[in-house]
Curated annotation (Swiss-Prot):
CDD domains: RecB_C-like. This is RecBCD enzyme subunit RecB. It comes from Mycobacterium tuberculosis (strain ATCC 25618 / H37Rv). Heterotrimer of RecB, RecC and RecD. All subunits contribute to DNA-binding. Interacts with RecA. Co-immunoprecipitates with DarG in the presence and absence of darT. The lineage of its organism: Bacteria, Bacillati, Actinomycetota, Actinomycetes, Mycobacteriales. It comes from the Bacteria.
Length: 1094
């Protein structure tokens, strides 16, 4: 396989290219480089590129790296910075005109960087389905749930009771088995369930029937709850792409000409089906992955899918330079790994060249780049070929590791010229008990160490204390619950203090519980945590041993409870039950993993799965030689390339034994790849152990070193058992002679003292010389208007109710005309009521067959979140009736005389959130000052004198408002954008301002005064510029004069239905304004001025 040359010919459209990486060979750099070259050298734009990776952290990193590479290239092409590598030097080649074109293309890419689709597979599928609408078979109001565990648990509870609740004998399936079975089949929709035809009445038949019932009921409940999981996104998109004339496929191919997929070795059959159907033989499809690091089979990753896809590629290359590790370490590891097959003939470790020629670890007591410490039997009192118990080794090896780390830290060793510290060291394991043993040994040696992967946070003491608190909230009159809560970390009482103070203490705690429960009901769970902190919980917990750990867990649980309360709209009893279910469910999603309790420099202890993608100067592998092989109830395996999940239980006879054999082989292959990942995390040194345990015959490191000899590529699934210490040492010595690991006997010596006299440095005052740019801010229309009264520096726009509405607008004269009563005359006004109306109009479907029922349902859905002074039972029907006429009110000439009811969901973009860079918003360096006064000058120069809003130019030039700077970012949300026939787009803003109780109070003149009084012209201008920017990269052949239709401000109280009075073409309640196209373009350029000149 040839090596990939980043500066070679770019992959062409209509081809599939596979780039096979190895550990440390710079996949992300290659991806960023390819994107930069496509942008600079071809006519491709960022919105035509799709970059997919497999988790959010990788997506964020990829976005930052791509943008950083483009910024670096722009700097070099502008002459601001020297070329920093071969890629930039390549881009600098060519004539002045060619360089200018590259610079222009890359600057355009930076200016429109938000157009780039850099996302996880599920984010990408979700956005595609949302944009496809009906073509993607995706309802607009379906809620995406990150985890279906709670729903599956509810279904298991119901089905288990229905199937086994009345049995007099023990059921064939325990509840724990039923829950594990259900979660396994739901989480792996690509797998076929086996055995296919179990004997009727057998345990296997019961298990398969139960799994089928769970899957069927899950689909039914998801439909009823309007919910879907991540796997549903993939399945629905794959289904939408299935037909030969699929409109989804046409749209995806039309939008994305270049598709790059990172971490492709972790794909699954459904993900590849989507990519293949959408882009194969049409787009330039580039798949980047390392099959040697395919370790996520238990999460759905399928190496067979990778191999199948790679086998159909038009071109395959390898990345051949290791940018991570020193040459000495690369060569030593290559001695062991080169040409080794890791579970498949096509998964081969290929040779790489090291970028770092020297050895960055200097003055270490044992400097060999790859060390193997061998535990001989006599060290622990064994001899011959006896197996050393793993429990004995869980004491010896961690102690040996701690002594080795202590010697290294005390030696004065340096890495890359600086002293080695504890944070430079990682200990990588596969099992939690091994991690805990190493953490305890390091702690006893006085070496700080952190391990976050030992438990789910819901298994912590903090979770138990939160549950105890929530139970007491529900019944503060029950002394038993109150006294239990008193003994939690929230109060810190003890059995002694409870006995001494008795009822007085119980009454005091009960009073606090009532107060905190009231906080929780009105302000959320976070308010309870804050109240506990103010009461001294933090100081008390931190004063105890392990206090940092406990306080971190308490805060973590508080955050998860707060999110669950908002996401699922749970009250205190619901939160109590939710927390109880989480604790019962066991291991959950990544956000349930315990967080770091300290950011101090410490040895990092982690599992291989956590370590993947990371690097450390020194890596210790204490138990990579050992692997216990077990047979679970549920087995994953492949049958002739088909992914299968055996759920028939352990009593399956010959068929079960065959499946167990297939599963063991795949597990052995996975373990080899885990060992490869662990060995390749180090930059300068790897230290591993070997010992003669019963299970060392299965361990990845044992099979690599003891199961083969130098020069052999095939790695056995199992080593020859029962070798003597001398036989094992002889094999290891052969590897050392060939350039492999340096072999050492594992004997624990005296620990080195970590305490060394440290010279006390002199102290001097540090002076702050930089100038803080106080005009740079993240602002909004509302903040700009409020800022005219008092200018303050804020980090975020203010949140809350509808800040852009006033209860009563001051107008000069009463309205005249038809005395038609407003449909909302009897309803209240105010920001809370306005927020409720906006929420209803945002989510209601105007094309619903029964619009009144639809509006009433939406009012009921949103009313609990907004306090409105109307009887709760009457609010929904009254407000629904009041909002119905506005949907039949003509919108005037600007909207082609249509009504809101006639403009369906497919022609609406509701709640268009934006974050728009202003002058100096996203590039460093000083940019020209722009203020609202400059906007006023533009308004004055572009608006004719008879424009109803022309007087607003003077308002923008006034002191206070005109002085407001426009530097940083403008954030906000447009209520709705309507698409009219002919591809014209209207910005629409709903207003509930109270101007009077009849339609006459909402005539055009009155609305004009209200607009000017409330500074709405500024909002309208900014929102039209946002739409202009949006259409510029989303509308084909965009032309502002053709596509921009202006703005509609809908004062809903004046919209009385088909009978709404119309004066000079202006329906009551409808304010129409179409700012000149030249003004919109000029304002967009003005706001962008600083960025364009940077």
């Amino acid at each position: 396989m040839d090596r990939f040359e980043l500066l070679g010919p770019l992959p062409r459209e209509g081809t599939t290219t596979v780039l096979e990486a190895s550990a440390g060979t710079g996949k992300t750099f290659a991806l960023a480089g390819l994107v930069t070259r496509y942008l600079a050298e071809t006519a491709a734009t960022l919105d035509e590129m799709l970059l997919i990776t497999f988790n959010r952290a990788a997506s964020r990193e990829l976005r930052e790296r791509v943008r950083g590479q483009i910024v670096e290239a722009v700097g070099a092409l502008q002459g601001d910075a020297p070329p920093s590598g071969e890629l930039v030097e390549h881009l600098l080649r060519g004539s002045d005109a060619e360089r200018a074109q590259k610079r222009s293309r890359l600057r355009d890419a930076l200016a429109n960087f938000d157009a780039a689709t850099i996302a996880t597979t599920h984010e990408f599928c979700g956005s595609v389905l949302k944009s496809l609408g009906v073509a993607g078979d995706n309802a607009a109001d379906v809620e995406l749930k990150e985890s279906l565990t709670d729903l599956v648990t509810e279904i298991v509870d119901d089905r288990y009771l229905a199937n086994f609740g009345r049995q007099e004998t023990d059921p064939e399936l325990t509840y724990a088995e039923a829950l594990a079975l259900a979660l396994a089949v739901v989480d792996d929709p690509c797998a076929q369930l086996r055995p296919p035809d179990p004997e009727p009445g057998s345990k296997a038949a019961v298990r398969l029937r139960f799994a089928a019932e769970v899957l069927e009921e899950l689909e039914r409940r998801k439909g009823r709850l309007r919910a879907q999981g991540f796997n549903d996104l993939l399945i629905r998109l794959a289904t939408a792409l299935e037909a030969a004339d699929s409109p989804a496929r046409d749209r995806m191919r039309e939008r994305w000409r270049i598709v790059l997929v990172d971490e492709f070795q972790d794909t699954d059959p459904m993900q590849w089906r989507v990519l293949e159907r959408a882009f194969s033989r049409h787009s330039a499809l580039i798949l980047i992955g390392d099959p040697k690091q395919a370790i996520y089979g238990f999460r759905g990753g399928d190496i067979h899918t990778y191999l199948k896809a790679a086998g159909t590629a038009d071109a395959r290359y390898t990345l051949g330079v290791n940018w991570r590790s020193d040459r000495a370490l690369v060569e030593s590891l290559q001695t062991v790994l080169r040409d080794a097959t890791l579970g498949h003939a096509d998964i081969v470790v290929r040779g790489t060249d090291a970028h770092h020629a020297g050895h960055r670890l200097a003055s270490a007591p044992r400097p060999a780049p790859f060390r193997l410490r061998v535990v001989k039997r006599h060290t622990l009192g064994y001899d011959g070929t006896a197996h050393v118990p793993i429990e004995a080794l869980r004491r010896h090896i961690p102690d040996d590791l701690a002594a080795d780390v202590a010697a290294l830290l005390a030696s004065g060793a340096t890495f890359a010229g600086r002293p080695v510290v504890a944070a430079d060291i990682a200990v990588i394991v596969e099992h939690h008990k091994d991690a805990r043993a190493c953490r305890n040994a390091l702690a006893e040696a006085g070496i700080p160490a952190i391990y976050t992967g030992d438990t789910d946070v819901f298994a912590s003491q903090a979770a138990k204390d939160w549950l105890c608190l929530l139970e007491a909230f529900d019944a503060p009159q029950r002394s038993g619950l109150v006294r239990a809560a008193a003994c939690t970390m929230f109060f810190g009482e003890t059995a002694e203090s409870l006995a001494a103070e008795g009822d007085a203490l119980t009454d005091r705690v009960a009073g606090t519980l009532r107060e905190w429960a009231d906080h929780a009901r009105h302000r959320g769970v976070a308010a309870v945590f804050q109240a506990a902190q103010l009461a001294g919980m933090g100081r008390r917990v931190l004063s105890q041993r392990g206090g940092e750990r406990d306080l971190t867990d308490l805060a973590h649980i508080a955050q998860l409870l707060h999110e669950a309360a908002h996401r699922e709209r749970l009250g205190l009893p619901g939160l109590r039950d939710w927390l109880r279910r989480q604790a019962k469910a066991g291991a959950g999603p990544p956000e349930h993993n315990r967080r770091l309790d300290s950011d101090a420099a410490a040895v990092q202890i982690m599992t291989v799965f956590v370590a993947k993608g990371l690097q450390f100067p020194i890596v210790y592998l204490p138990f990579a030689f050992n692997r216990n092989v077990r047979s679970d109830d549920i087995l994953l395996y492949h049958d002739d390339g088909t992914r299968c999940l055996y759920i028939g239980g352990k009593d399956g006879g010959a068929q079960r034994r065959t499946v167990e054999g297939l599963n063991r082989v795949e597990a052995a292959h996975d373990n080899l790849r885990l060992t490869y990942v662990a060995l390749t995390r180090a930059q300068s040194q790897v230290v591993a152990w070997w010992a003669p345990t019963f299970d060392e015959v299965n361990g990845g490191l044992s099979r690599l070193l003891r199961g083969r000899r130098p020069g052999q590529s095939q790695v056995p699934d199992r080593c020859t058992p029962r070798v003597t210490d001398e036989q094992a040492w002889a094999v290891f010595a052969q590897w050392e002679a060939a350039g492999g690991p340096s072999v050492e006997e594992s004997v624990i010596g005296a620990r080195s003292s970590l305490e060394k006299p440290v010279p006390v440095p002199g102290f001097e005052v540090r002076h702050f010389h930089r100038r803080i740019d106080t005009t740079w801010r993240r602002t909004s229309y509302s903040d700009l208007v409020r800022g005219s009264e008092a200018v303050t520096v804020t980090s975020e726009p203010a949140a809350g109710g509808r800040a852009d509405e006033v209860e009563i607008a001051v107008v000069a004269a009463p309205g005249s005309g038809a005395d038609l009563t407003s449909p909302l005359a009897a309803l209240p006004s105010g920001a809370s009521f306005g927020s409720l109306v906006h929420a209803v109009l945002e989510t209601a479907d105007p094309a619903a067959p029964d619009l009144a029922a639809e509006l009433e349902a939406q009012v009921r859905r949103h009313a609990p979140w907004w306090t409105v002074d109307v009887d709760h039972a009457q609010l929904a029907p009254e407000l629904a009736r009041a909002l119905l006429p506005m949907h039949d009110t003509p919108l005037g000439p600007a909207a082609a005389a249509l009504t809101l009811r006639q403009i369906g969901v497919r022609d609406r973009l509701r709640e268009l959130d934006f974050e728009m860079p202003l002058a100096g918003g996203d590039l460093r360096g000083r940019s020209p000052d722009v203020s609202l006064a400059d906007v006023g000058e533009l308004l004055a120069s572009h608006l004719p004198g008879d424009d109803p809003l022309s007087p607003y130019a003077d308002r923008l030039g006034s002191a206070g408002l005109g002085d407001q700077p426009l530097r940083g970012y403008l954030a906000g949300s447009i209520d709705v954008v309507l698409r009219l026939p002919g591809q014209r787009y209207l910005v629409v803003d709903y207003k509930t301002n109270h101007l009077g109780d009849t339609a006459a109070d909402y005539g055009f003149e009155r609305l004009t005064e209200a607009m000017l009084h409330s500074d709405y012209p500024l909002q309208a201008l900014l929102y039209v510029v946002v739409l202009h920017r949006f259409l510029r990269w989303r509308q084909r052949d965009y032309a502002p004069a053709r596509h921009l239709g202006g703005v509609l401000y809908l004062f809903v109280r004046g919209m009385c239905g088909a009978a709404t009075p119309v004066t000079a073409g202006h329906p009551a309640g409808v304010f129409t304004w179409n700012p000149p196209t030249a003004l919109v373009v000029a304002l967009s350029d003005l706001l962008d001025r600083g960025r364009l000149q940077s």
